């Protein structure tokens, strides 16, 4: 993976980039490009599982800025208000594309 942008510090409070290492949130290893809810051994909220979304630029642009509104009832939205700077959102998305 590339070096994480400063905005990722907010993400790593709950998420690991190591495969199979879940924290409060699921591991982000290989997350970009797959359907939500597929990190092994992580208990997702029913709202997340029902969303059917794919983790891509369009989804992340909305979700990272406002997780509560993008997937109502999800756990992340209850704890994290979102990244307010669009440049931070773009930097985190670019980084997640490199996290295998």
UniProtKB/Swiss-Prot annotation:
Gene3D superfamilies: Cytochrome c-like domain
Post-translational modification comment from the UniProt entry: Binds 1 heme c group covalently per subunit.
SUPFAM superfamilies: Cytochrome c
Residues annotated as signal peptide: none
GO biological process, one term: photosynthesis
InterPro entries: Cyt_c-like_dom, Cyt_c-like_dom_sf, Cyt_c_1A/1B
Keywords per UniProt: Electron transport, Heme, Iron, Metal-binding, Photosynthesis, Transport
GO molecular function: electron transfer activity; heme binding; metal ion binding
Pfam families reported in the protein's UniProt record: Cytochrom_C
Residues noted as binding heme c in the record, renumbered to the chain: 11, 14-15, 76
Domain of life: Bacteria
Role of this protein: Cytochrome c2 is found mainly in purple, non-sulfur, photosynthetic bacteria where it functions as the electron donor to the oxidized bacteriochlorophyll in the photophosphorylation pathway. However, it may also have a role in the respiratory chain and is found in some non-photosynthetic bacteria.
PANTHER family: CYTOCHROME C (PTHR11961)
UniProt similarity note: Belongs to the cytochrome c family.
Annotated protein name in UniProt: Cytochrome c2 iso-1
Lineage: Bacteria, Pseudomonadati, Pseudomonadota, Alphaproteobacteria, Rhodospirillales
